[in-house]
Design a protein with these regions (language model features):
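Active-site segments that bind and position negatively charged phosphate/pyrophosphate groups
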Residues: 91-171
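Short Gly/Thr/Asp-enriched flexible loops that form oxyanion-binding sites at enzyme active sites
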Residues: 1-4
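A glycine/threonine-rich phosphate-anchoring loop and its flanking beta-alpha core
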Residues: 6-96
Length: 171
């Protein structure tokens, strides 16, 4: 980042982080969201994604269904604290979200077309940070809970991934 190197990403699992301009970094045990620069290209080979561990695909699914809580949290922050709120990313996510949820079992079984839906919505969610200039599009209270687990569970950390923790916090 500091050297401003240009990079591209070749995805091995569906994930919204590939298309964001931020990075969650642990610094002295505390998670911080830092500004990063965007990849010049993000490439998704659905055959590769269909072979990723099922647990990671489920984590990606969980990390995008948090849209419901993130949107409500962000809107409440706007109404109560006058923070900026932009609904545009949610209009874009709505184009695919219901179909993705209906295809959850097909995603779990590695169906290429269903994985394409998950991948598309993950990319859109990540890209939402580019035109809103905030991670609020898909990261609010549920992500805070996940980061809290990572920072403070120490020896009793359950070994769950970020997406798994976000999914549980969303429920």
């Amino acid at each position: 980042f500091l050297e401003k190197k240009v990079y591209s990403v070749f995805a091995t699992t569906p994930m919204n982080a590939y298309t964001t301009g931020t990075a969650s970094i642990s610094f002295k045990g505390i998670k911080k969201s830092l500004v990063a620069h965007y990849a010049q290209g993000v490439f998704f080979d659905l055959e590769v994604l269909s072979k990723c561990p099922k647990r990671l695909t489920a984590a990606a699914f969980a990390d995008v269904i948090c849209r419901t809580t993130a949107q409500v949290d962000w809107l409440m922050s706007h109404k109560l604290l006058n923070t900026d709120y932009q609904p545009t990313p949610y209009y874009l996510l709505a184009l695919y979200e219901n179909e993705m949820i209906k295809n959850a079992s097909s995603i779990a079984s590695g169906d290429i077309n269903a994985l394409a839906l998950l991948t598309r919505i993950s990319a859109i969610m990540g890209l939402g940070t580019s035109f809103t200039q905030t991670t609020h599009v898909g990261s609010m209270g549920e992500h805070g809970i996940s980061h809290y687990i990572d920072m403070f569970a120490k020896d009793i950390h359950p070994g769950t991934s970020h997406g798994e923790q976000v999914g549980i916090a969303t429920i």
